[in-house]
Amino acid sequence: MTPIGAVVRACLLEVSRRRGVIVLLVLLPMVFYLVRRDLEGQSIRMLALGLGWTVSTVALFVAVSARGIDRRLRLSGYAAWHLVVGRGLAITACGLPLAGMFGLLIAVDQDVDRVWAVILLLVTTTLIAAPLGAVFGALLPRDLEGALALLVVLATQMLADPSERLAKILPFWSTREIGTYAIDETGYDYLARGVAHFAATWLLLIAAAIAISTIRLRLARIPAPQVTQGGA
């Protein structure tokens, strides 16, 4: 098995053992949705952001809980990017089925013409959330601080004016743009901006997570002892 495959398998086993995590993955976005179910646009946007916060928080918890074994894995020959990519794939594999399930729920429960765009909205939000949680997990040593920091990011994204620069530099701005295209049936430019922002943010977050983990897990190089030849 490849190093990435081994990390994916270990991460999936870890998540599957925590029933509370599985309940959180399903319940929290659903609560976000039901609170605003009578308002079509707001309910879908709340569902997407709830899914993003949940997936990123699970990614954060996985990264923080694995800190104790990361250095041992590095000593065993695993590169830092093996750990980041493997866990990212595992968390994404947990989130994408939920994105499909919630997309089906919206198709049945709401009168939306662009259902495919809603599913795209949920998928891109999930893909952004996994490396976002990894970045916070690499930066912050405790899961409580990381979860609160993610909550601040989410709240700021919800409250900021989408046209302002602050909203555009936050990771879930693509969620708002693609959501506007899917729900309000605006022009293609909203979709194009959202997809472009998603792609750039996704690549940036993955690169940041790998860079931070590489620095944090770098191995100290011990110089080889110098052998001196004694005289007769």
Where are the regions that the model predicts?
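Alpha-helical membrane-inserting segments
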Residues: V35, L60, P97, M101-L105, ...
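Transmembrane helix segments
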Residues: V35-D38, L140-W173
